[in-house]
């Protein structure tokens, strides 16, 4: 795979020098490197024991919404890492936008037909996939760029590290369509809030900030702002030149792969519980009285507050675990 251009002076094709900071996936995709190609996603061998899962939606290639094809290819790649065949994975591609969320048409169709078990299964499959990414045997490095919305955020947040393009528009925007994040987004935002923030901030202050970010469907207009809003972690890498994204992510994956240990399962999450939820509910009532939100907005806000404050089990002296948050998130969704 070499690039060449026609040189008008030499009057013949001239091979371009390979930039060591750039992996061109279009050139890299030869028969030997593509391990499996599905309708909307593919698994590639990037060399050095690193896999690449890339999206190329057959329905909306410009936006790359999540569908079952994405989940299948991510699961295949994770299984290859689990078996020891490969040691790390890069989640990224070189399309127009990284991922503009989940395919809501599928969810709408299931709900309109009253197929609640199937809907629950679809959401749980996405949640389980995000947990598999988080606890993978080898590091998963995500490389987001341009639009990263809803489910797109939920796919990258559980990765071991993120290498984001400086120009990245990122946000959990589900509240804008009358839903709350359902693919693990609430759990990731809670974990990011607990790990981030200042030492002077208590659990309620951290969750209040997260509630405002998700509840108002705030979209970061840069990778740096995404860190400030809690979508990205403070130690995530930001790359100015998007062409360098995949190579930088691969280098980071190889760096992390040496002696990699998956994160510990969190069963010690201390969330505000009913007391914190009451305070958030009062704030919602204030917004409603001022005409800033509708009746339905208030209902969605209360569902979101229920999940972020830890449901019925959380409290000042009681801890909850990751799976409990995922379960109440799925129920509220």
Predicted regions span which residues?
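Single, functionally critical "micro-switch" positions that shape active/binding sites
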Residues: 66, 102, 159
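Intrinsically disordered, low-complexity segments enriched in small/flexible residues
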Residues: 1-90, 191-218, 228, 234, ...
């Amino acid at each position: 795979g070499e690039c060449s251009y026609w040189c008008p002076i030499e009057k013949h094709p001239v091979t371009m020098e390979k930039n060591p900071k750039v992996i061109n996936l279009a050139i890299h995709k030869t028969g030997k490197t593509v391990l499996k190609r599905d309708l909307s996603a593919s698994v590639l061998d990037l060399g050095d024991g690193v896999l690449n899962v890339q999206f190329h939606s057959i329905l909306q290639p410009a936006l790359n919404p999540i569908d079952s094809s994405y989940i299948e290819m991510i699961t295949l790649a994770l299984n290859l890492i689990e078996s020891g065949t490969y040691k790390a994975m890069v989640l990224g591609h070189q399309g127009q936008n990284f991922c503009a969320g989940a395919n809501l048409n599928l969810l709408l169709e299931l709900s309109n037909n009253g197929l609640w078990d199937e809907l629950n299964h679809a959401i749980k499959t996405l949640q389980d996939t995000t947990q598999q990414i988080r606890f993978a045997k080898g590091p998963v490095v995500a490389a987001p760029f341009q639009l990263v919305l809803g489910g797109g955020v939920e796919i990258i947040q559980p990765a071991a590290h993120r290498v984001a393009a400086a120009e990245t528009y990122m946000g959990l925007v589900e509240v804008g369509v009358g839903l709350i994040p359902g693919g693990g987004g609430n759990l990731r935002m809670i974990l990011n809030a607990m790990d981030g923030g200042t030492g002077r901030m208590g659990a309620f202050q951290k969750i209040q900030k997260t509630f405002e970010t998700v509840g108002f469907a705030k979209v970061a207009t840069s990778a740096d702002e995404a860190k400030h809003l809690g979508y990205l972690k403070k130690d995530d890498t930001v790359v100015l030149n998007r062409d360098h994204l995949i190579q930088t992510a691969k280098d980071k994956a190889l760096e992390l792969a040496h002696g990699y240990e998956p994160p510990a399962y969190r069963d010690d999450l201390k969330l505000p519980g009913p007391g914190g939820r009451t305070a958030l509910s009062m704030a919602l009532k204030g917004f409603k009285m001022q005409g800033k939100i509708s009746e339905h907005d208030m209902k969605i806000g209360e569902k979101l507050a229920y999940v972020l404050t830890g449901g019925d089990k959380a409290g000042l002296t009681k801890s909850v675990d990751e799976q409990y948050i995922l379960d109440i998130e799925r129920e509220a969704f």
